[in-house]
Amino acid sequence: MENKNKDIFEHTIKFNTGVRLYMFQTGSIKTKVKFIKMNQGEEPYEIPVPWFLIKHPQGDVIIDGGMPIEAALDKHKHWGSVADVYDPVMKVSEWCRDQVKTVNTNPEDVRNVIQTHLHLDHSGAIGHFPNATHIPQRIE
């Protein structure tokens, strides 16, 4: 029987372009089921808050950026009463600007920040990568 996984592995190596995708997490949001699934219950509901870094030979790209550092420092000051319903739980060390350094990326070298949408839990990179071009969705 032929090993199909071996063929996939060989093609991956053959077509390696130097592009790498990293997934990180900036904590989670604690809420209730009713706020996620249209009034379906009072049970607790926790949502992980991921974000992504693409290391590319032509420049690194951040997608979203997770929660902003302010969510870890003073969530009520930054999010106001939204934090009473969607409680951001985040450590300072989970901030995207610090996490990129763990994979040898200099925040000043990030070329683009792509915003899939501008909810509070996707805005962690905004304003913290000064040399990046920020690219929001047109609808935003």
Predicted region positions:
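NAD(P)H-dependent oxidoreductase Rossmann-fold/reductase module
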Residues: F9, N16, M23-T31
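Short alpha-helical segments and helix-capping/turn motifs at coil-helix boundaries
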Residues: N5-I8, I47-P50, H119-L120
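C-terminal regulatory/interaction regions
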Residues: M1-T17, F35-M38
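Short glycine/serine/threonine-biased micro-segments
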Residues: Q25, D64, H122
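Active-site metal-binding motif and surrounding structural segment of the metallo-beta-lactamase
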Residues: H78-P136
